[in-house]
């Protein structure tokens, strides 16, 4: 097997979809890749691919994102969709693509990188790419219908549903909930609230970014719920 590397292009997206199916065991809509890689308000995806003949056998991608550090905004990038075809794993594809892509990002003015690697790619990021583990992601999950979870014994599923309905649901007193995409005025108010907080490193949540991030073309079935208190 011989493979070479080159910069990812928009024309590669169908082949990237095939690689995703081969490595992840499922397919995702083509419109998702167009949304993620080509319509990001911070810039198109920066990526490197490994090619063997007419096949893409590996990919490393950095997604540009504006990061707010206090009052300063810097260009960062998030590592996403790292993939190596099973037949090419253990041959240096991941490391070669990652190093080339990080150099590409540096040339485009990217100053900060971050990512959320899965257990398979985590060792490579830390040991081979010299990334630091700065913390773990906390997940907040609430089961709406526990009886649908296979881990719950059949005999206790109906009881689990009853308990879920009586569990505390949080305080909504004095709040007005609106479902649906908020108006430009509401988005501006949210942005002003976030920007007033100091000493926080986070994605710069501009209205344009939020419209893109939760766009229906992401195919993630996001739903906007806005809570108002006191107007």
Model-derived regions: residue spans:
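A conserved beta-turn-beta hairpin within the catalytic core of GNAT-like acetyltransferases
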Residues: 67-79, 89
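Conserved catalytic-core motifs of GNAT/GCN5-like acyltransferases
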Residues: 67, 116, 131-152
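A short helix-loop-beta-strand connector motif used in the catalytic cores of GNAT acetyltransferases and
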Residues: 37-49, 53, 58, 126, ...
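Short amphipathic alpha-helix that is part of the acyltransferase structural core
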Residues: 1-37, 41-52, 56, 62, ...
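Non-catalytic substrate-recognition and accessory regions of acyl/acetyltransferase enzymes
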Residues: 199-223
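Short glycine-/small-residue motifs
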Residues: 59, 231
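Conserved acetyl-CoA-binding loop-helix of GNAT-fold acetyltransferases
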Residues: 84, 89-103
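Conserved GNAT acetyl-CoA-binding A-motif
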Residues: 105-118, 128
């Amino acid at each position: 097997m011989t493979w070479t590397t080159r910069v990812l292009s928009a024309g590669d997206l169908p082949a990237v979809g095939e690689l995703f199916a081969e490595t992840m065991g499922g397919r995702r809509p083509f419109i998702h890749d167009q949304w993620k890689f080509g319509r990001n308000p911070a810039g198109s995806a920066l990526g490197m691919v490994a090619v063997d003949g007419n096949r893409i056998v590996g990919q490393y991608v950095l997604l540009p994102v504006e990061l707010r550090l206090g009052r300063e905004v810097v260009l960062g990038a998030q590592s996403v969709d790292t993939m190596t075809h099973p037949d090419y794993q253990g041959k240096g594809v991941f490391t070669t693509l990652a190093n080339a892509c990080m150099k590409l990002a540096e040339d485009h003015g990217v100053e900060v990188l971050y990512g959320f690697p899965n257990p398979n790619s985590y060792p490579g990021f830390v040991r081979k790419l010299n990334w630091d583990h700065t913390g773990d992601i906390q997940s907040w999950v609430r089961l709406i219908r526990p009886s649908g979870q296979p881990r719950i014994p059949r005999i206790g599923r109906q009881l689990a549903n009853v308990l879920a309905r009586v569990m505390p649901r949080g305080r909504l007193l004095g709040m007005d909930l609106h479902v649906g995409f908020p108006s430009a005025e509401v988005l501006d108010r949210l942005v002003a609230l976030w920007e007033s907080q100091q000493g926080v490193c986070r994605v710069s949540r501009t209205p344009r970014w939020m419209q893109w991030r939760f766009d229906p073309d992401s195919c993630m079935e996001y739903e906007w719920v806005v809570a108002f208190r006191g107007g």
